[in-house]
Amino acid sequence: MEEMEKRVLDYWTVRAHDFGVVRRNEIHNKLSKRWSDELDRLLPEGKLRILDVGTGTGYFAVLLAAKGHTVTGIDLTPAMIGEAKALADELDISARFEVMDAQSLNFPDESFDAVVTRNLTWTLPEPVRIFGMAPRSRTRRDPHKLRRKLRQQCPQQ
């Protein structure tokens, strides 16, 4: 594991529980509706297989699974995955969560219809590499729309 990855892992391991409390509160307020509407606008129609990269406490994964999508959330931090599973269980939502490095995905091509992420790129040593995730998904609408939105988070790349 590279030094930066270790620092990110240590940072989020210490903060996982408190961050989980914040996201639990957020899932029950009007901000969730706004995020849900924005995701609906950006994602193709229909029930999708969605990969949530850097799922953290599972916020996006839970929002999307509640809409009937099949969601897999991945995160580098086992403590965050624990928080994500707890949130999904608490809300009786079915989603799959795995510990995995966002820059070394272990899924065959076309495993997903869409890939989402929130607040991930700032933690990555090479954020542009996540844009190479497109082969893991097959998109039916403009596959660049979400990438453009992500690039706004790291314009220097």
Predicted regions and their residues:
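A short SAM/SAH-binding and catalytic strip from SAM-dependent methyltransferases
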Residues: 114-127
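Conserved class I S-adenosyl-L-methionine
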Residues: 1-45, 59, 63, 83, 141-157
